[in-house]
Amino acid sequence: MHGIDLLSLLIWLPIGGGLAVLAVGDAHARLARWLALIVSLATLALCVPLWQGFDATTASFQFIQRLPWIPQLHAEYYLGIDGISLPLIVLTAFMTVPVVIASWSVIEKRVAQYFAAFLILEGLMIGVFCALDALLFYFFWEAMLIPMFLIIGIWGGPRRVYATLKFFLYTFLGSVLMLVALIYLYLKSGDYTIAGFQSLPLTLQEQCW
């Protein structure tokens, strides 16, 4: 399978699967569980050709996919992986399977919504690890917080409301600061590519900020 198809499949298969589980609904909770398990296993299976096709002898990004996204902002749908992101992607896909299995009989209410949230979260996390465009990374990062917020707030423990509020405040503040930093780096480099950011001759003071 070509790398261009592979990374996008790893991202959008669990997201699409999550939406399908959501469409199944709680009226067919058993089907929702099985569909979630099948999608999580299929996503994990896609990691096999990714791992086999990865060349560990080079430090450059591999499985590159680069398409226009928001031309007005010089943002691209730019994906790729290196030796750091590869194991994180595999770990994410691997851990989703036991999460689905462990929740099989524990979650009895809003079953479809629960499994949909985890599958969508999986796809968005993989997107975070694949994104080579900072704005695309920011999109995946921010979108990832939505299913996390729902999982904590709906299926969390006794203090889930407090935990959700605290989670929101921390992530909102961090997201604002991250966005400011990305805009600053964009103004310095002229695009949102991670490689462009890495090549910037930033002063020590700028790096500390």
Where would I find each of the regions flagged by the language model?
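Transmembrane helix-loop-helix hairpins at membrane boundaries of multipass inner-membrane proteins
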Residues: 1-6, 23-116, 190-202
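Small-residue faces within membrane-embedded alpha-helices
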Residues: 12, 36, 47, 93-96, ...
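Short glycine/serine/threonine-biased micro-segments
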Residues: 15-16, 34, 81-83, 91, ...
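Hydrophobic residues within membrane-embedded alpha-helical segments of Major Facilitator Superfamily
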Residues: 17-20, 39-42, 88, 94-95, ...
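Alpha-helical transmembrane segments of multipass membrane proteins
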Residues: 18-23, 48, 97-101, 123-127, ...
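Alpha-helical multi-pass transmembrane bundles of energy-transducing inner-membrane proteins
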Residues: 27-29, 116-120, 124-209
